[in-house]
A protein has these predicted regions:
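A residue-identity detector for tryptophan
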Residues: 20-21, 167
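Structural signal for membrane-spanning alpha-helices in multi-pass inner-membrane proteins
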Residues: 31-39, 89-97, 153, 157, ...
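Short, Lys/Arg-rich, polar N-terminal cytosolic tail immediately upstream
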Residues: 1-17
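Membrane-embedded alpha-helical hairpins and interfacial helices in multi-pass inner-membrane proteins
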Residues: 106-197
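Alpha-helical membrane segments and adjacent membrane-interface helices in multi-pass membrane proteins
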Residues: 13-15, 22-27, 37-109, 113-114
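Short hydrophobic/aromatic segments of transmembrane alpha-helices and their interfaces
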Residues: 5-6, 57-59, 160
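Generic hydrophobic segment detector
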Residues: 1-5, 64-84, 115-133, 188-189
């Protein structure tokens, strides 16, 4: 038997259902911020790490929030739009700063972003439908998305070039992102499912 809502509840539900595009814009903005910060680094001992490692977990968190509240289809739209805006931003900025645009420069990041987002989205949707919000499984979904992202980024952008300290910086990045993901997973597990799920 379908739920019956009062007039006020229906108005709130309509506003909530129409608000998904704001989160898609937020996702696009965070993706562009992560792209902008990828060239800025900080050093931990002899390791050079980029500031975007702190932004990337938030990207997956926002995508998972869209999935949980508004459904799989809205997340696919969000991933497509943010990926397209990432390429457009790189194109516009290359002309603004007077450099030639090279798709090669953004291909690793773009492919890593899109593939890891769809892997994350597929696993997360499976967890939403078939489990009751497991903390460990949600955390592992985030971590697996990072592994896929760095795999494609390394494969396409760096041509599998592995420097002397590559693995140390790789695992350091995953550990730092994992610590941030513990907090985000705590919030993620406590978000209520939306109407589309």
């Amino acid at each position: 038997m379908p739920k019956r809502y009062t007039k006020e509840q229906k108005e709130v539900l309509e506003v909530e259902q129409d608000g998904w595009w704001v989160y898609v814009l937020l996702l696009s903005t965070i993706v562009i911020l992560a792209h902008s910060l990828k060239d800025y680094t900080f050093y931990v001992e002899n390791l050079s790490l980029t500031y975007s490692i702190f932004i990337l977990p938030v990207v997956y968190f926002v995508t998972n929030y869209i999935t949980k509240k508004y459904g799989y289809a809205k997340s696919v739209i969000g991933i497509a739009m943010s990926g397209l805006l990432l390429v457009l931003f790189a194109l516009v900025m290359s002309f603004v700063i007077g450099r030639n645009f090279s798709f090669y420069d953004i291909s690793g990041e773009f492919c890593g972003y899109v593939v890891s987002q769809f892997v994350n989205l597929t696993i997360y949707q499976f967890l939403l439908v078939n489990t009751t919000g497991s903390f460990i499984l949600t955390f592992l979904t985030y971590m697996f998305a990072f592994v896929v992202y760095y795999l494609f980024y390394t494969l396409l952008y760096m041509n599998l070039l592995v420097f002397d300290n590559y693995w140390v910086s790789y695992f350091s990045t995953l550990i730092l992102q994992g610590m941030l993901c513990l907090l985000l997973t705590f919030f993620d597990v406590h978000i209520k499912k939306g109407l589309e799920i």
